[in-house]
Amino acid sequence: MLAIVGLTGLGLKLSFLLTMISGGQIFFAIFLVMMISLILGTGLPAGPTYIITAIMCAPAMLQIGMPLLIVHMILIWYSIDSDVSPPIAVCAMAAAGIAKADPMKTMFTAWKYSKGLFILPFLFYYRPLLLNGPWLDVIITIISCTMGLIVSAAFLERYLHTKANLYELALLGLSSLLLLWPPLFLNVLGLLFLGIVSYSQKRRIAKERRSGPVEKPQLAVP
């Protein structure tokens, strides 16, 4: 595979296309790298996927102004994602075989639960998540990003303290985005929305306890 990339000039062509299609916009460049890594990862393990994406994508990412450390952390992170991404999802398929579970259901459940993998590489660039900034910014980033990922999991499962209604689900989705995005005032706004949902659900739980049994969460078993 590496010989094909080198002899055909595919690496240089893809690097040029990545720069051209993204228009030099870093957000779109990271998104395109995610898609390339996802496609390569359907048939290759993490190591070869990283090597090939580094050959094909790293020059273009450096050319549009991304730091070297962040470029390779993004490529490594998305390469790891190949193990749980359909349609191959090697790790999920192995787990399904061990558990004697439905392979397709296990694969898509693993993909759903690993959604944080898709978000974190963007944070590597837009936030000091790699500990390359002032210590106060790093602490705020770690706390807000951790909260954002927890809230995004609650959004995907439609469950915080109890099952979320449509209004609460919308607030959870908005809260997770605001907690992950850089400006501090947006993080505070995200916490406010999370507090509203938490208060609303706790009130509903208290009301249900007075009138009947509380709804229990359903575990997603592949």
PLM features per residue range, with description:
Residues 1-222:
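Alpha-helical transmembrane segments of multi-pass membrane transport proteins
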